[in-house]
Design a protein with these regions (language model features):
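Catalytic cores of nucleotide-sugar-dependent glycosyltransferases that transfer UDP/GDP/TDP-activated
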Residues: 1-384
Length: 384
């Protein structure tokens, strides 16, 4: 079996997660483990999974090893020191880099095939020409790939001259599985939503939300690109239509200051933290709708995950959201913004049969890597 190495500065299992990149790395690694002998090299964040691993080993000074869910993890205390050692030790046939593109130049021995994935265009500023070092470059959705090619800047010029494509991310549906009751208060499915009512009751008790409210959930970095301005304009519309906004996240000072002034009387509870995947799942299981009115969105992992829990997305169709969201499973935000979408949500919430049908459609939509990993396997094999 050929060897595939992921190089990343983010991994949930490695305990160094800051964004959706961490989830993508771990879930894609798990998904292709039947096709390749997979190794993940990442910073050692003393993650709970690593601490629980019975076979955690000290490989060398500052490098620990563990095997989790069929994938070998090398955890580096001093990132990225030690990467050369791991590459020499494992000798991968394919290296897939999710971290800084220039890391490839630090390797004493270049693997036969090297792939790079762009998650955020802003991260590439000043690094554009390093992409030419790779055999193939991908980004996290087909729609975002088109946006990058149409930017009219140095990045779009380089991408137009190299082997570049968009591959829409999937999620690990074996973990985000309400029918198994993993990380939720009760099991439920698209055929039986009784457990979701239990999860909502638990959420309301935990956060002191009146049980009769339609719960809008938003979990994100508090930045303009996530559509937070539009959400703040709609706060009182949400309240007056019988809703309650639970917003979890932290970010720019201007937004934190605005949220700090809002109270439960405004129908808002702001939780100033970024939840881990384990903490996010009970929120999705208990909430009715998930707000994702992004101005710019490379992929949109959270709306996909929300669908798994019957938490209906309220979303724009910007960036990667075009690849994943539509009217069947989401309330689409149009020119009238979140305020206009809230009116649609209130009407939907007032008709239980229609609400249940849309929730079921959400949960039944296939966002798994099973339908998407084939494109990555083509890239790894050099078929494209």
């Amino acid at each position: 079996m050929k060897k595939l190495m992921f190089v990343t500065d983010e991994s949930i299992l490695g305990g160094c997660a800051r964004s959706g990149v961490a989830e993508v790395v771990d879930s894609l690694a798990n998904s292709v483990a039947a096709d390749y002998a997979v190794t993940v090299v990442c910073p050692d964040g003393n993650g709970v999974w690593a601490r629980m691993a019975a076979n955690l080993q000290q490989v060398s000074d500052g490098v620990r090893f563990c095997r989790l869910f069929g994938v070998d993890y090398y955890l580096l205390r001093r990132w990225p020191d030690g990467l050369n050692m791991v590459v020499e030790h494992t000798k991968p046939d394919v290296l897939h880099n999710f971290a800084a593109p220039e890391l490839l130049t630090t390797l004493a021995t270049r693997p036969p095939r090297c792939i790079y994935t762009i998650d955020q265009a802003d991260f590439m500023q000043g690094r554009e020409d390093t992409l030419r070092l790779y055999d193939a470059v991908t980004t996290v959705s087909k729609a975002y790939a088109i946006e990058l090619l149409e930017r009219g800047d140095q990045l779009s010029q380089v991408l137009g001259e190299i082997n570049f494509r968009g591959i829409t991310n999937g999620i690990l549906t074996s973990v985000f599985a309400p029918e198994k009751g993993l990380m939720t208060s009760a099991k439920y499915s698209a055929d039986d939503f009784s457990g979701k009512a239990v999860c909502k009751e638990r959420l309301c008790r935990t956060y002191g939300i009146p049980a009769d409210k339609c719960i809008y959930l938003m979990m994100c970095r508090l930045v303009r690109d996530k559509g937070i301005d539009d959400v703040l304009k709609a706060v009182h519309m949400i309240r007056d239509s019988g809703g309650f906004l639970l917003l979890v996240g932290k970010g720019e000072k201007q937004y934190e200051e605005q949220l700090a002034k809002l109270t439960r009387d405004d129908g808002v509870l702001w939780v100033n933290r970024w939840p881990s995947a384990v903490q996010a799942v009970p929120l999705l299981a208990g909430a009715d709708f998930y707000l994702s009115p992004s101005v710019a969105e490379p992929c949109g992992l959270m709306p996909m995950t929300a669908c798994r829990y019957g938490c209906i997305p309220i979303t724009t169709l910007n960036g990667g959201l075009q690849d994943n969201m539509d009217d069947e499973i989401a309330v689409i935000v149009h020119e009238d913004g979140v305020t206009g979408a809230v009116a649609k949500v209130a009407a939907l919430y007032a008709h239980p049969d229609a609400l249940i049908a849309k929730r079921a459609a959400c949960m039944e939509r296939d966002f798994s890597w099973a339908t998407r990993k084939a494109e990555y396997l083509e890239v790894y094999r050099g078929a494209v």
